[in-house]
């Protein structure tokens, strides 16, 4: 596959060495929130490579391994001789202890998962301004049994004696909890202390700076070549359209492929918004029948995603011959897309991520190997909230910037089982009601996603003294900061009642509404 362009040219102030944690990219995001640039790299990165990058700090991420087991991932031990501050998080702390002469064993009592009060023993350096009793997020089955020479305890919990440690004279620190997770109430204080007080970083990573660097890199790589953008109308592709328009102007052609799986009224809104209001040329391609015919009889969700991804690119290739030629395909791929499609486990022999898939994403999992385009993906290192900030800075209005995330395969993966015209029409009407009532209640901007799901089973009901057999609709509303983790939104009963009453009365083919109250993990936000 052709090379990818992403906005990453500068040296990072903080390097995160990834040992397979699901939160490695989240650490990078938290650091960027402090306006300091960070980069995630493989744990196999050598000390010499790190020295050449000249970072001001190194973070060793968590991971699923145990340092005392054969095949556990280890970093280059020379990293501890670079004279650079190091913060070990969870597995990273255990690794540092193990490498520097301490010992790690399975937790003597029980594994510690979830929230735990942190009792601060030494409120200095890393734990400055961290209030004793603050809630921190734990996720570990091993514990430090013996500290290396010179290390001191900074904090403990009821189950973990060495919850935070330090070797002050070398600026080595470790925390058994995850400060990057939103559940850690003073986690950002810990991160800021490390980034600013210990590593002496300067705040030089801002939204406008990202835009300037992304524009410059796109211009450098694309040159005078033409770029074709897959425009969906969501915040990701819309932000990308504005960014590329700023970078290369008339070299950009936006193409909206209506695959028939959009929400109600979206194709019309998209065309009028970009073409009429912002004068950005958008080529409209009606491929509804092509897509749905390819899904006939298909019930496996992974197959649906692959087929939609394949057809999506094929249409692009065909239309590019008519409109082009084009050299580059632009995609609004984000960090969570890449993480969930590649898995997070690490092969200790190669240092590569093992593809333990959660599910393939439309942007990255459905691409055919014979793809004829080079890829332009300047947003692939950003989280959703960062993309919204970029879009806002580029001039996108709130009606686009604040739109809820919508999957590339659209309603096709919110209909469990086979996709039909009848089911699509039913789901569109139900989904519109969910979003209308959420908006009417003033909750739209307080919720990460709110949508409907159609189940491929029949539920018995009674309407007008008649027995009915119709589809149930699932209402899915979640709160999140980045899509990596999510919790179900506690909607007022009055809002839920309106949604339910309207759906069963206004949507043909539905006689039951249920509420999904599953968090992520263990579930995912989407049902397929």
Curated annotation (Swiss-Prot):
HAMAP family: GMP_synthase (MF_00344). This is GMP synthase [glutamine-hydrolyzing]. SUPFAM superfamilies: Adenine nucleotide alpha hydrolases-like, Class I glutamine amidotransferase-like, GMP synthetase C-terminal dimerisation domain. GO terms for molecular function: ATP binding; GMP synthase activity. InterPro entries: Class_I_gatase-like (IPR029062), GATASE (IPR017926), GMP_synth_C (IPR001674), GMP_synth_GATase (IPR004739), GMP_synthase (IPR022955), GMPS_ATP_PPase_dom (IPR025777), NAD/GMP_synthase (IPR022310), Rossmann-like_a/b/a_fold (IPR014729). It is an enzyme of class 6 (ligase). It catalyses: XMP + L-glutamine + ATP + H2O = GMP + L-glutamate + AMP + diphosphate + 2 H(+). The keyword Hydrolase does not apply. One of its GO terms (cellular component) is cytosol. Residues 13-204 form the Glutamine amidotransferase type-1 domain. Catalyzes the synthesis of GMP from XMP. It comes from Prochlorococcus marinus (strain NATL2A).
């Amino acid at each position: 596959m052709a090379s990818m362009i992403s906005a990453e040219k500068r040296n990072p102030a903080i390097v995160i060495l990834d040992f397979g944690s699901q939160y490695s990219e989240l650490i990078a995001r938290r650091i960027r929130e402090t306006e300091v640039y960070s980069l995630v790299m493989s744990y196999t990165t050598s000390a010499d490579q790190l020295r050449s990058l000249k970072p001001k700090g190194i973070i060793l991420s968590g991971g699923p391994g145990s340092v005392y087991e054969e095949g556990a991932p280890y970093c280059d031990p020379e990293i501890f001789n670079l004279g650079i501050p190091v913060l070990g998080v969870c597995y990273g702390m255990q690794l540092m202890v193990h490498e520097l002469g301490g010992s790690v064993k399975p937790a003597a009592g029980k594994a510690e998962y979830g929230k735990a009060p942190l009792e601060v023993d030494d409120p200095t350096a890393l734990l400055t301004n961290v209030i004793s009793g603050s809630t921190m997020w734990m996720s570990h089955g091993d514990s430090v049994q013996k500290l290396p020479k010179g290390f001191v305890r900074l904090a403990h919990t009821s189950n973990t004696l060495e919850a935070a440690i330090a070797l002050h004279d070398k600026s080595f620190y470790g925390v058994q909890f995850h400060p990057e997770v939103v559940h850690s109430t003073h986690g950002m204080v810990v991160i800021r202390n490390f980034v600013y007080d210990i590593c002496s970083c300067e705040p030089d990573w801002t939204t406008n700076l990202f835009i300037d660097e992304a524009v410059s890199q796109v211009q450098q790589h694309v040159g005078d070549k033409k770029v074709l953008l897959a425009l969906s109308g969501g915040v990701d592709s819309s932000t990308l359209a504005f960014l590329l328009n700023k970078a290369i102007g008339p070299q950009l052609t936006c193409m909206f492929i209506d695959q028939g799986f959009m929400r109600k009224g979206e194709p019309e809104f998209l065309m009028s918004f970009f073409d009429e209001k912002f004068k950005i040329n958008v080529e409209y391609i009606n491929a509804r029948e092509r897509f749905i015919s390819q899904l006939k009889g298909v019930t496996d969700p992974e197959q649906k995603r692959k087929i939609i991804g394949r057809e999506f690119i094929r249409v692009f290739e065909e239309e590019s011959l008519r409109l082009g030629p084009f050299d580059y395909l632009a995609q609004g791929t984000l960090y969570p897309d890449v993480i969930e499609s590649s898995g997070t486990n690490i092969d200790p022999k190669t240092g590569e991520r093992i593809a333990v898939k959660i599910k393939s994403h439309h942007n990255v999992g459905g691409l055919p190997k014979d793809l004829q385009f080079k890829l332009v993906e300047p947003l692939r290192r950003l989280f959703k909230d960062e993309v919204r900030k970029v879009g806002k800075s580029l001039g996108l209005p709130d009606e686009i910037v604040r739109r809820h995330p919508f999957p590339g395969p659209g309603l096709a993966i919110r209909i469990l089982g086979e996709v039909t015209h009848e089911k699509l029409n039913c789901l569109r009407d139900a989904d519109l009601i969910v979003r209308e009532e959420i908006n009417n209640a003033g909750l739209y901007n307080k919720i990460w996603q709110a949508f409907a799901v159609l189940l491929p089973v029949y539920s018995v009901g009674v309407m007008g003294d008649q027995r009915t057999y119709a589809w149930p609709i699932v209402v899915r509303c979640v709160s999140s900061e980045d899509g990596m983790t999510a919790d179900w939104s506690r909607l007022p009963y009055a809002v839920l009642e309106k949604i339910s009453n309207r759906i069963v009365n206004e949507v043909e083919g539905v006689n039951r509404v249920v509420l999904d109250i599953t968090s992520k993990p263990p579930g995912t936000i989407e049902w397929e």
